[in-house]
């Protein structure tokens, strides 16, 4: 069966790990988050990498996503890993930022939220930003609020 599949004009394209950000993350208005191990500050091998095929800088930044502790339905702390964990952390950060902005300035849009979070990202020494793995750096909501406080 496998031989029949490979007969004829079937060939495999040379893959490129630097174009693994897909829809909906490859859209300008969407916040796209890479995920990393907070213990050793390394991007997960399975985290999407950018940029997009149209050269948008994606991911926008990275959030913790390896062995992140949270409470399960039984009230116990458990570790979870994956892009969904980083997405949940990012969504929580955006919700807190949105609440603050609504009380202060009105209703922000998704691009404003993303740009303000980018403004507060942490960047490691010796790396050029933005880059294909980390985007603009590591999510740091405290730093975002600190920057906004000083404006």
Positions of predicted regions on the chain:
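Secreted peptidase-domain scaffold signal
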Residues: 144-151
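Substrate-binding/active-site groove segments that recognize
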Residues: 59, 139-140
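Extracellular S/T/G-rich loop segment that most often corresponds to the catalytic His/Ser-adjacent loop
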Residues: 14-95, 99
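Short secondary-structure boundary micro-motifs
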Residues: 6-7, 44-46, 52-54, 113-115, ...
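Hard-cation-handling environments
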Residues: 1-6, 10-11
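Short polybasic/polar patches that bind polyanions
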Residues: 132
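Hydrolase catalytic cores
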Residues: 65-129, 138, 146
């Amino acid at each position: 069966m496998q031989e029949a599949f490979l007969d004829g004009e079937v060939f495999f394209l040379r893959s490129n790990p630097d174009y693994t950000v897909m829809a909906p993350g490859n859209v300008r208005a969407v916040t796209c988050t890479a995920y990393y191990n907070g213990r050793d500050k390394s991007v997960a091998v399975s985290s999407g990498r950018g940029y997009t095929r149209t050269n948008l800088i994606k991911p926008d930044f990275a959030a913790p996503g390896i062995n992140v502790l949270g409470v399960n339905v039984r009230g116990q702390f458990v570790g979870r890993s994956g892009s969904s964990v980083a997405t949940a952390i990012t969504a929580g950060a955006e919700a807190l930022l949105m609440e603050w902005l609504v009380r202060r300035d009105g209703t922000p849009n998704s691009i404003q939220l993303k740009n303000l979070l980018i403004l507060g990202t942490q960047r490691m020494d010796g790396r050029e930003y933005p880059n294909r793995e980390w985007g603009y750096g590591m999510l740091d909501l405290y730093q975002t609020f600190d920057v906004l406080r000083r404006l």
